[in-house]
């Protein structure tokens, strides 16, 4: 049990700290202050003292009340302090006393003023109901004193003490009936009511006695001490009797305090019953009961709130939230997690479970994002709306079509004379300007023959220019396949045939170099038949014309065959529509900016047109034809150089004229986004398997390159050729590839990434060279693609790890062993093969099994240290950190040589 402090006990007894300390001093309990701690025995002693005072005060008050009822005036209290006020009892009038004889009654008894015949104490009623037999016995022989008390007459001292002992002090006061009270109708009703009241009083007395007998325990004071808090008197309070007040019989209802009742187990139930029986009265509950009631109310309130909250939560949790998202393109991990209602960590965890290492800002392509969202419980809708990037190619009505010049592509193997043949047709010298006599990019020209135009496209024949050759085949109507009569069919010849067949382009074969003595056109025809090109004279449909670019023999026949093939194909186009065509080549001119060579296929391109070329937009500011002259319009099948683009387009992009610049900008922006998504999708993903492979194989070495070329096609060709050189050990990493001169920005990029700058047909400025020297960046300039490939191969070979090879130096047989102090075991050996060198690598072989691999620590010949011992000589050999050598072992000396590898 917890200790009690003085101020807590004073608060419980409702007295001041000073009065309590004085009282405890009179009782022999000395304390220093109100914070002093009291023992349990001291607390019980103080409570019993105050309880005796309250009991005496209650008895004195009962004397005063009885005297007041008789009209004798207040009784002096003789200095006894008042007991604390009990709960205020509502006024109830006592019924008029009966004389006991029915004959003396006038046939009606007096009713109480309130008109209620029920007993005031419900608690007593319940006791009476539980003990009907006892109540019946008591009803038969009720004493006269009890009847007198019930009639409102005062009790003498002996009777008062007996009433208190029987527990009747708690009976609520009864008032005299009013003088003007009405009589009850029927004497039997009045007698019945009086009889019931007597029975209840006798039952109450017996129940009180039983309770007093059963509650005689030591902790009685502690059990009802808290109840007495409400009943404790305030210090210095005077009673009305002491103040000289007199209370008449017809005044306010009396307040008779209850004496301390015996605390029983059913005390709270009795109090609840009493409070329920008197709805107008204030319950005289103890502090503990009030606290318990408050706790119960709070607990009920919390339970109701939790119950309501649980219902609300249950109502909220019932519909399962399913996120429905619409995906139109790539999306970052963080944005995807936000849209499907998950955290970024959950999405990353799922991706790692699928073997994809992702970060919070990494973008996922459309397919991956849709798969992740579906697996994480979201409903995914892929918006398949037609993107703005696609421009429909309008179908022209037949009446609007006009005949147009054919577009002819000259294709073939390198050095078979394509450019020379085209030069002979144009009667201009173009080959001399090409580096090494090799065409580096597509050239577009127009030739007039018999008042008709023919547009020629010259494609490179080198293997690195496959993409450019494929674009030339896609943009052409007729393909001229040039085959040298002395060389025959070569690899690029076969590739050109495949490109033309894939594009569905008719092929005209030009067998060139027939002027040479070793020329054999028949052999060429025979070889071409193996690839499905059968000459007309052999029953096929392929036109083959022998020509000579040097002597110009057969050139007119070749052009006539081209026009004949064009007539058969009926090439037509509508010149009165917005222009549409293909980008042949693009380059960056220092004075004019981005310049694109475009071939108009439909419509007419005019100055001021807004066009979109791939992911680039612009407004046509100027157009230059193949002769270098400015033109205002370009009809179908006309190649022109266009100025006014925002950036360099890719070779092979489709261009189309649109209504205004705003639409062109929107389309270009959308295409740039699509291009970025495709690059993201095509990029190699870092998976766990890749990480394990890299960890097992070691770090992959990279050769970083920055490529700058004169035209876009050359840069693409270099990129494709160099990327093919990558191996599992050395990778070519192209950091940047652009068109134009080498700039300081390129030097800064190369310096930061330790890259080499390769310039193809471009030259750096003086300040760029100086910046490269200061930064330690190497710039290599080339004009022929062969040299670039060879030099890059050599550089990659230098990055390869050298190959290690083991070289056996010699073998020695152990014939004796010696234990040398501080040196361990030394083997006496005889060199049987080669030589044994000091500090060489060695292994000990015992019965064909290697038992040690290490290094020779010492080598001696007699007592002298030697560098090596040749075959046929004896020596002493000491091995490093190995002493378990035995006779008969073989010591094998060897070394490791590194051999440089090549690609």
Curated annotation (Swiss-Prot):
Pfam families: EF-G_D2, GTP_EFTU, IF-2, IF2_N. InterPro entries: EF-G-like_DII, IF2_II, IF2_N, P-loop_NTPase, Small_GTP-bd, T_Tr_GTP-bd_dom, TF_IF2_bacterial-like, TIF_IF2. It comes from Moorella thermoacetica (strain ATCC 39073 / JCM 9320). Residues 121-132, 204-231, 263-276, 285-296 have a biased composition (Basic and acidic residues). Residues 139-152, 178-195 have a biased composition (Low complexity). One of the essential components for the initiation of protein synthesis. Protects formylmethionyl-tRNA from spontaneous hydrolysis and promotes its binding to the 30S ribosomal subunits. Also involved in the hydrolysis of GTP during the formation of the 70S ribosomal complex. Residues 66-296 are annotated as: Disordered. One of its GO terms (molecular function) is GTP binding. This is Translation initiation factor IF-2.
């Amino acid at each position: 049990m917890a200790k009690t402090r003085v101020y807590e006990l004073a608060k419980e007894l409702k007295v001041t700290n000073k009065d309590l300390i004085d009282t405890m001093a009179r009782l022999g309990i000395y304390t220093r202050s109100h914070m002093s701690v009291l023992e349990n025995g001291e607390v019980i002693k103080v409570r019993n003292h105050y309880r005796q005072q309250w009991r005496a005060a209650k008895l004195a008050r009962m004397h005063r009340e009885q005297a007041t009822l008789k009209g004798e005036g207040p009784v002096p209290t003789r200095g006894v302090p008042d007991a604390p006020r009990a709960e205020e009892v509502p006024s109830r009038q006592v019924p008029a006393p009966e004389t006991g004889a029915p004959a003396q009654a006038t046939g009606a008894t007096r009713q109480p003023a309130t008109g209620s015949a029920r007993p005031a104490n419900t608690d007593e009623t319940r006791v009476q109901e539980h003990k009907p037999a006892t109540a019946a016995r008591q009803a038969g022989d009720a004493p006269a004193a009890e009847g007198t008390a019930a009639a409102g007459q005062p009790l003498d001292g002996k009777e008062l003490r007996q009433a208190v002992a029987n527990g009747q002090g708690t009976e609520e006061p009864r008032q005299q009936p009013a003088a003007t009270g009405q009589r009850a109708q029927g004497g039997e009703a009045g007698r019945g009511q009086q009889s019931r009241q007597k029975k209840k009083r006798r039952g109450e007395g017996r129940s009180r006695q039983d309770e007093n007998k059963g509650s005689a325990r030591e902790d009685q004071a502690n059990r009802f001490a808290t109840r007495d808090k409400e009943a404790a008197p305030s210090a210095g309070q005077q009673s009305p009797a002491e103040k000289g007040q007199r209370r008449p019989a017809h005044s306010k209802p009396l307040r008779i305090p209850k004496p301390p009742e015996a605390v029983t187990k059913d005390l709270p139930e009795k109090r609840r019953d009493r409070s329920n029986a008197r709805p107008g009265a204030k319950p005289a509950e103890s502090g503990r009961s009030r606290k318990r009631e408050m706790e119960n109310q709070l607990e009920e309130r919390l339970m109701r709130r939790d119950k309501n909250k649980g219902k609300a939560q249950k109502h909220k949790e019932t519909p399962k939230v399913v996120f429905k998202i619409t995906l139109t393109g790539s999306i970052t991990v963080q944005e995807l997690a936000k849209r499907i209602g998950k955290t970024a960590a959950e999405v990353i965890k799922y991706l790692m479970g699928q073997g994809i290492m992702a970060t919070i800002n990494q973008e996922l392509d459309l397919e991956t994002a849709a798969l992740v969202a579906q697996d994480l419980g979201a409903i995914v809708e892929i918006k398949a709306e037609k993107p703005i990037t696609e421009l429909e190619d309008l179908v022209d009505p037949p009446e609007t079509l006009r005949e147009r010049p054919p577009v002819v592509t000259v294709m073939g193997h390198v050095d078979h004379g394509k450019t020379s043949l085209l030069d002979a047709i144009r009667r201009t010298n173009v080959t001399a300007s090409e580096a090494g006599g090799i065409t580096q990019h597509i050239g577009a020209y127009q030739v007039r023959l018999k008042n008709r135009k023919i547009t020629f496209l010259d494609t490179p024949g080198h293997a690195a220019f496959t993409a450019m050759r494929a674009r030339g085949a896609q943009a052409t109507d007729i393909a001229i396949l040039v085959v040298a009569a002395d060389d025959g069919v070569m690899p690029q010849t076969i590739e050109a045939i495949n490109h033309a067949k894939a594009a569905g382009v008719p092929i005209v074969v030009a067998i060139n170099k027939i002027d040479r003595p070793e020329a054999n056109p028949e052999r060429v025809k025979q070889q071409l038949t193996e690839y499905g090109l059968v000459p007309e004279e052999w029953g096929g449909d392929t036109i083959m014309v022998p020509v000579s670019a040097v002597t110009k023999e057969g050139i007119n026949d070749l052009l006539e065959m081209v026009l004949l093939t064009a007539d058969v194909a009926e090439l037509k186009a509508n010149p009165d529509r917005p222009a549409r065509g293909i980008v042949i080549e693009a380059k960056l001119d220092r004075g004019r900016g981005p310049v694109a060579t475009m071939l108009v296929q439909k419509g007419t391109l005019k100055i001021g047109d807004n066009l979109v070329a791939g992911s680039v937009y612009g407004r046509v500011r100027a157009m230059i034809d193949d002769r270098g002259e400015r033109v205002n319009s370009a009809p179908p099948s006309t190649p022109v150089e266009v100025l006014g683009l925002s950036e360099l387009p890719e070779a092979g992009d489709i261009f189309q004229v649109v209504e205004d610049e705003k639409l062109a900008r929107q389309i270009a922006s959308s295409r740039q986004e699509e291009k970025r998504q495709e690059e993201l999708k095509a990029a190699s993903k870092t998976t766990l398997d890749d990480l394990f492979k890299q960890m097992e194989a070691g770090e992959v070495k990279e050769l970083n390159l920055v490529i700058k070329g004169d035209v876009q096609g050359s840069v693409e060709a270099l990129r494709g050729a160099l990327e093919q050189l990558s191996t599992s050990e050395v990778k070519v990493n192209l950091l940047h590839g652009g068109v134009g001169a080498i700039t300081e920005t390129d030097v800064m990029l190369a310096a930061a990434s330790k890259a080499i700058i390769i310039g193809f047909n471009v030259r750096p400025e003086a300040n760029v060279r100086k910046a490269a020297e200061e930064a330690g960046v190497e710039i290599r300039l080339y004009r022929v693609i062969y040299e670039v490939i060879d030099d890059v191969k050599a550089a990659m070979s230098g990055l390869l790890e050298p190959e290690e090879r083991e070289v056996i130096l010699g073998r020695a047989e152990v014939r004796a062993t010696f234990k040398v102090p501080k040196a361990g075991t030394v083997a006496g050996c005889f060199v049987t093969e080669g030589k044994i060198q000091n500090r060489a690598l060695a292994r000990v072989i015992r019965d064909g099994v290697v038992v040690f691999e290490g290094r020779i620590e010492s080598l001696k010949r007699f007592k002298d240290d030697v560098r090596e011992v040749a075959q046929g000589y004896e020596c002493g050999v000491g091995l490093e950190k190995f002493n378990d050598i035995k006779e008969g072992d073989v010591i094998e000396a060897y070394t490791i040589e590194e051999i440089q590898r090549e690609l």
